[in-house]
């Protein structure tokens, strides 16, 4: 599948058109952001980790009967996906309160949000 022009770019990934209108290449970048995207730096391997984690989650959902957009992993940082209307949802997992959630919920920065587990 040939990757063509850039369709859209977010904080962590880019979507590219392909020769098939129903499919896109999702490219996970090594970009990291802080301060609501105002500070961008590169972290080598981040795109690979995010691509593999995304594929793990999507394959798990699919195994439980939840259809998803993932078609195949193309390489370390790219996957072939179906072109769909996005359902905007974000999940950030931390073991402590940080970032914009502290402002929204009035939480103390650094407050433990769950007990440690081994």
Regions inferred by a protein language model and the residue ranges of each:
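Active-site loop/lid in soluble adenylation, ligation, and acyl-transfer enzymes
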Residues: 2-115
